[in-house]
Curated annotation (Swiss-Prot):
Reaction it catalyzes: 4-imidazolone-5-propanoate + H2O = N-formimidoyl-L-glutamate
Entries under PANTHER family matching the protein: IMIDAZOLONEPROPIONASE, IMIDAZOLONEPROPIONASE-RELATED
Name of the protein: Imidazolonepropionase
One of the protein's GO biological processes: L-histidine catabolic process to glutamate and formate
GO molecular function, one term: imidazolonepropionase activity
Cofactor section: Zn(2+); Fe(3+)
Organism for this UniProt entry: Acidiphilium cryptum (strain JF-5)
Length: 401
């Protein structure tokens, strides 16, 4: 069998669903052709391969390219001052009601043109590349008007076309209310105009919403999701972050790819998510920055068999964190995830949360050849340490990226 590239003499953590745990293979090899994995497994069992290029990994660890399944990477302005305000005792809600929070970023983002949006996000993404991330989700939601939201999604698509990352674009029009419109008019714009136009233009892979008292209620989100499903788009949800508002159950009702945050999600809502196949995306960065006390019910997620992913939630206000490795470590320390759960949470389960479960997130024949090659003796070192990543090489679609 011919292949373009062959990585041999490696230790693999395949994260493949047909292998137990992290799917560890000692003395492993991976072969790719036309950007896809054609074989992965023990080198001793490798079929006869004729490789155009062979890379001796010298015993290094290879994992799937990491997947960050929840980010707000396109934005304007700076909200670092809100950190000091919260330290002084102001709440997230009070800052938002006084024109800070999402609306502050909205004003700054509306002032950017599409080129500036793309340039800012690409500069930030250098930190993700340095950590072996190959797939990233990018949301809109900081424009809250037609022109800016479309520009954000076009910028996200342009970043994906540039080839350094696989980008899943998500329309988050129902993030908060823009100040210049009333609720009925804005929801009508989102549901009747924006979602159909975005779907027709292929600008988004999914539609997200923020289901909280300070944003949108369950009935309003249901209308947004109905419009998304009618347009053929998947749905995701910011759910039960600040209070139990039935977000997890709502996500399950619409067969959402994921529900994210979930600090206040009920055990019943989590069980409904598991039955619906929705992934629970844990966002410990926001929990940390907001100094929350309520943790997601990880025990209920385990008991229900609900897959767990971990993401940065990178945004300029409540999770200004540019490290998926740190987020995974936080999920272990703050939320009690195991080492295995954390790794699956930033690989296979994160891909599932984007509807990309058959495409990336595991080293498995037929998937895209997205790899992270680590200069470590043990995978423990990748998540145990905070700071520069011990990354040797990052591969996207079979090519060094």
């Amino acid at each position: 069998m011919r292949c373009d590239r062959l990585w041999r003499n490696a230790r693999l953590a395949t994260c493949a669903p047909d292998r137990p745990g992290l799917g560890v293979v000692e003395g492993g090899a991976v072969a790719s052709r036309d950007g896809r994995i054609v074989w992965a497994g023990p080198e001793a069992e490798m079929p006869s391969l004729e490789a155009a290029e062979t890379i001796d990994c010298a015993g290094r660890w290879i994992t799937p390219g990491l997947v960050d399944c929840h980010t707000h990477l396109i934005f304007g302005g700076d909200r670092s001052g809100e950190f000091a305000r919260r330290l002084a005792g102001e709440s997230y809600e009070s800052i938002a009601r006084e024109g800070g929070g999402i609306r502050a970023t909205m004003r700054a983002t509306r002032a950017l043109d599409e080129a500036a949006m793309r340039a800012g996000a690409e500069a930030r993404l250098a930190a993700w590349a340095a950590e072996g991330v190959t797939t990233v989700e990018i949301k809109s939601g900081y424009g809250l008007d037609e022109a800016t939201e479309l520009a954000m999604l076009r910028a996200a698509r342009a970043i994906g076309r540039a080839g350094r990352f696989r980008v899943a674009a998500t329309y988050l029009g129902a993030h908060t209310m823009p100040p210049e419109m009333d609720r009925a008019a804005y929801l009508d714009l989102v549901c009747r105009r924006m979602i159909p136009a975005i779907a027709e233009a292929g600008l988004a892979d999914a539609v997200d919403a923020f289901c909280e008292e300070i944003a949108f209620g369950a009935g309003e989100v249901a209308a947004v999701f109905a419009a998304a499903r009618a347009a053929g788009l998947a749905v995701k949800l910011h759910a039960d972050q600040r209070a139990e508002g039935g977000g997890a159950a709502l996500a399950a009702r619409f067969g959402a790819l994921s529900a994210d945050h979930l600090e206040y999600a009920s055990a019943e809502g989590i069980a409904a998510m598991a039955r619906a196949g929705s992934v629970a995306v844990l966002l410990p960065g926001a929990y940390y920055v907001l100094r929350e006390a309520k943790r997601p019910d990880v025990a209920a997620m385990r008991a229900a068999g609900c897959r767990m992913a971990v993401a940065t939630d990178c945004n300029p206000g409540t999770s200004p964190i540019a490290s998926l490795r740190l987020s995974a470590q936080m999920a272990c320390v703050f939320f009690g995830l195991s080492f295995e759960e954390a790794w699956l949470g930033i690989t296979r389960h994160a891909a599932d949360a984007l509807g990309l479960g058959g495409e990336c997130g595991a080293i498995d024949a037929g998937r895209s050849c997205d790899l992270a090659i680590w200069s470590v003796d043990s995978l423990d070192q990748v998540l145990a340490w905070v700071g520069p990543a011990p990354l040797e090489r990052r591969v996207l679609k079979g090519v060094d990226a």
